[in-house]
């Protein structure tokens, strides 16, 4: 790291917006298992990790692309329902390996109302993990994607071209976005029956 008389350059991963070293230090000191949620522009990534001096040990993980490949999910891989399903899937795998409690590691995401990170955590809680998240309000209709279905219905009646443009991925995979809540239930049942 470069040092100057008035300025000290931060660590590379902090400059890149990848690691909050203060929070990481707190997690390492606590020695608790972390429930890590990362949202990218295309996917949701969930990992359950144990702290180890040599490096973190991944107990279980799930990637939202698995929903498409293994469970035939036809929606987007980075929306609210897929965040919930990815969290649920990762938690099922962790529970199988004997994990019962975790702490939420949301990284540099801002803990704001409606953030997809909390829907992934809610999925893990519903799968059987104990994760303290405080008094964050989570709307059950958003978990199923009812807000997406309502918007799609409204847009279809008002502007068909924009509807086809915004929901091209859904339509290309053979799903009408208005049917997303029922498709969500179907995929959730597949995940439950497979056991992760």
UniProtKB/Swiss-Prot annotation:
It comes from the Archaea. Signal peptide: none annotated. One of its GO terms (molecular function) is structural constituent of ribosome. Pfam families: Ribosomal_L5e (PF17144). GO terms for biological process: ribosomal large subunit assembly; translation. GO terms for cellular component: cytosolic large ribosomal subunit. Keywords: Ribonucleoprotein, Ribosomal protein, RNA-binding, rRNA-binding. SUPFAM superfamilies: Translational machinery components. InterPro entries: Rbsml_uL18_euk (IPR005485). This is one of the proteins that bind and probably mediate the attachment of the 5S RNA into the large ribosomal subunit, where it forms part of the central protuberance. NCBIfam families: PRK08569.1. Belongs to the universal ribosomal protein uL18 family. Part of the 50S ribosomal subunit. Contacts the 5S and 23S rRNAs. This is Large ribosomal subunit protein uL18. It comes from Saccharolobus islandicus (strain Y.N.15.51 / Yellowstone #2). The lineage of its organism: Archaea, Thermoproteota, Thermoprotei, Sulfolobales, Sulfolobaceae.
